[in-house]
């Protein structure tokens, strides 16, 4: 189990699991100090290499409920060890909001809003071609951080005007994803970018499910409930 949450440890300690399985926990808590200080020197490729050496021939599977790091690193480690798992390239395409929209626009163009990538390493120098208002968010983020409804170019520039410290934190947060993206895909737009999207109205839901051996299995349709007056998820 990579990058376990408290729920994972409690649930997997239940007798129904302990009776038949042995779990090994690896990773750190991205949202708790001092664990998250490890981001300053974290190298995802070396991390996968180390775990592959440590667990080769000792385990039957790699799992993670951690969206930010865990799912992708679990896929990379499973592939390295020859264990069942998702293709890392598929995880990357699903988690990178710009490339996910590119796939959606080819498969279901009528259900995909207009969108545009906005790299921020060199600052934002021109408004998005899709115009305003638009919804802007990082191509790789968590907990709706930096997601905003933007009405003007001035608001967009203010949103993307990061201090040196903020820029450092953002780079460290997405560097593991960028490193693995370059390793497993030909994608050229890294995670240090935002995506601007056409405004959508309506009920917001999650379609939960999975694909196994080419067969799509839908688990359910889940309501997304936001904190009042915000774009932050409160519960599902």
Describe each PLM feature range.
Residues 133-155:
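Conserved anion/nucleotide-ligand pocket segment
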Residues 71, 144-146, 177-178, 190:
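Domain-scale recognition of functional cores that engage charged ligands
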Residues 154, 191, 198-236:
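ATP-dependent carboxylate/phosphate-activation module, predominantly the ATP-grasp catalytic core
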Residues 79, 91-110, 123:
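Glycine-/Pro-rich loop/turn segments that contact NAD(P) or position catalytic residues
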Residues 114-120, 148-151:
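Short acidic-hydrophobic, aromatic-tinged amphipathic segments that line or gate anion-handling sites
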Residues 1-90, 119-124:
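ATP-binding N-terminal substructure of ATP-dependent carboxylate-amine bond-forming enzymes
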């Amino acid at each position: 189990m990579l990058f376990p949450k408290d729920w994972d440890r409690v649930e997997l300690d239940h007798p129904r699991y302990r009776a038949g399985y042995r779990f090994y926990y690896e990773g750190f808590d991205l949202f708790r100090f001092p664990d998250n200080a490890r981001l300053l020197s974290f190298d995802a490729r070396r991390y996968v290499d180390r775990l592959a050496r440590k667990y080769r021939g000792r385990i039957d599977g790699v799992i993670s409920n951690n969206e930010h790091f865990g799912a992708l690193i679990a896929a990379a480690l499973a592939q390295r060890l020859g264990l069942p798992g998702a293709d890392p390239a598929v995880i990357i395409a699903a988690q990178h909001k710009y490339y996910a929209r590119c796939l959606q626009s080819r498969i279901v163009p009528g259900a995909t809003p207009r969108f545009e990538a906005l790299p921020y390493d060199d600052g934002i120098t021109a408004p998005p071609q899709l115009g305003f208002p638009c919804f802007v968010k990082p191509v790789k983020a968590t907990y709706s951080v930096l997601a905003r409804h933007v009405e003007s170019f001035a608001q967009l520039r203010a949103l993307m005007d990061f201090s040196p410290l903020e820029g450092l934190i953002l780079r460290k947060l997405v560097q593991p994803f960028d490193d693995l993206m370059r390793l497993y895909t030909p994608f050229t737009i890294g995670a240090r970018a935002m995506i601007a999207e056409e405004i959508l109205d309506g009920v917001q839901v999650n379609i939960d499910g999975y694909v196994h051996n080419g067969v799509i299995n839908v688990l359910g349709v889940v309501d997304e409930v936001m904190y009042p007056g915000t774009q932050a998820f409160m519960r599902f």
